[in-house]
């Protein structure tokens, strides 16, 4: 039984090693179930993360992580019951973080945990080791230089445990949440992507590369917007980053899953802002589908072969690159030519048959191998699908 002295935020006493051990234990148990072997690792991560998010005590968390061999994995909370309304008041009193009262856990990432205190979101840095390209201090410096539609930084401080914390306006939704709900109306897609391209225009004009464009990085004030570009934890800045990452020696471990640009996959350390435009193009394709799903297939980052799987999915979808379609790749450390089976690829009409021609034109202009040929953010805003009021 949980002791009376256990802190309200029981997660503070849980180490990364504890979580890893639980994931491995869950994985071992699932290997004895009827699940295919390829699914057990991802399900283990999902089960542990669900327990971490929803448990009210360490005992409850530990119990949720104890999966008996042969037992079917529990249904994730978001599928088992309706999600609470974004403005619904939590039942527990929450915890105190700095001067913020009634803080409630929302989510966690590689280096941070996010809490909500009324209208404020608090990003608490819990991983203090240097995990490049993650740098919360650089993130804060970059955010202070930006304006809407980039997410506004309200404050930074050290909490009671001396953990660095960033404060933002709380946004109840993200583009990722809309994608999970099903088809998105065209006018809504247009509105949110106008905000995204406007934000990218703003940061790219200043030489900043976001490096992790994905649906969860676009936060929404409401289902109809406005949208704000967030998650600058791995962003590259021409002045703030250059001491550890020279412009021609940037880190390659950037991006998330199916939104990663091919130049980073093939070792081009001199990549530029076009990596963001590739990510935006793949996001747009996903959102425009009647049944939203990623344009390319990619295994979870922790799974073996995730990068190769993404490369093959790209090649099979839009065709293997050639020296004519991707001339800049000839100078890469690992050129993609003559290394893989040659795939002809498919037309955009075949890849996205249920997407309007105007949106397909923009997607095709963004999802190109040669980065110098991709549409820029200001150019994207001038495409017909972005300027129309109806489609």
PLM regions: where:
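Glycine-rich ATP phosphate-binding loop
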Residues: 113-127
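Protein kinase glycine-rich loop
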Residues: 103-109, 114
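Activation segment signature within eukaryotic-like protein kinase domains
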Residues: 192-193
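Conserved short submotifs of the Hanks-type protein kinase catalytic core
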Residues: 161-174
């Amino acid at each position: 039984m949980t002791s009376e002295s256990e802190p309200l935020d029981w997660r503070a006493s849980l180490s990364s090693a504890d979580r890893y051990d639980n994931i491995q234990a869950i994985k071992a148990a699932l290997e004895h179930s009827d699940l295919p072997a390829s699914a057990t690792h991802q399900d283990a991560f999902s089960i542990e993360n669900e327990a971490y998010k929803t448990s009210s005590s360490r005992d409850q968390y530990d119990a949720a992580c104890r999966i008996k061999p042969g037992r079917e994995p529990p249904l994730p909370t978001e599928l088992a019951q309706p999600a609470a309304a974004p403005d619904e008041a939590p039942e527990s009193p929450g915890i105190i973080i700095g001067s913020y009262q009634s803080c409630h856990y929302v989510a966690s990432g590689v280096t941070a945990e996010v809490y909500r205190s009324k209208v404020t979101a608090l990003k608490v840095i819990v991983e203090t080791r240097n995990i490049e390209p993650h740098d919360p201090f650089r993130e804060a410096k970059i955010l202070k230089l930006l304006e809407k539609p980039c997410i506004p930084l309200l404050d930074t401080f050290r909490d009671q445990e001396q953990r660095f914390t960033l404060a933002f306006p709380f946004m109840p939704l993200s583009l990722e949440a809309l994608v999970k709900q099903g088809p998105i109306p065209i006018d809504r897609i247009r509105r949110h992507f106008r905000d995204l391209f406007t934000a990218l225009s703003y940061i790219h004009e200043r030489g900043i590369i976001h490096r992790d464009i994905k649906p969860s990085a676009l936060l929404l004030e409401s289902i109809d917007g406005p949208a704000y570009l967030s998650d600058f934890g791995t962003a590259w800045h021409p002045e703030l980053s250059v001491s550890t990452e020279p412009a021609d020696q940037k880190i390659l471990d950037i991006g998330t899953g199916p939104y990663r640009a091919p130049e980073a996959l093939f070792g081009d350390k001199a990549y530029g802002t076009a990596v963001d435009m590739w990510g935006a193009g793949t996001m747009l394709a996903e959102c425009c589908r009647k049944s939203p799903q990623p344009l390319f297939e990619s295994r979870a980052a922790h799974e073996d072969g995730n990068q190769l799987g993404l490369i093959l999915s790209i090649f099979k979808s839009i065709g293997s690159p050639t020296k004519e379609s991707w001339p800049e790749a000839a100078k890469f450390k690992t050129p993609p030519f003559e290394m893989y089976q040659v795939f002809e690829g498919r037309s955009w009409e075949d890849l996205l048959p249920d997407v309007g021609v105007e949106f397909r034109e923009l997607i095709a202009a963004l999802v190109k191998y040669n980065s110098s040929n991709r549409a820029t953010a200001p150019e994207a805003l001038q495409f017909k699908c972005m300027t129309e009021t109806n489609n």
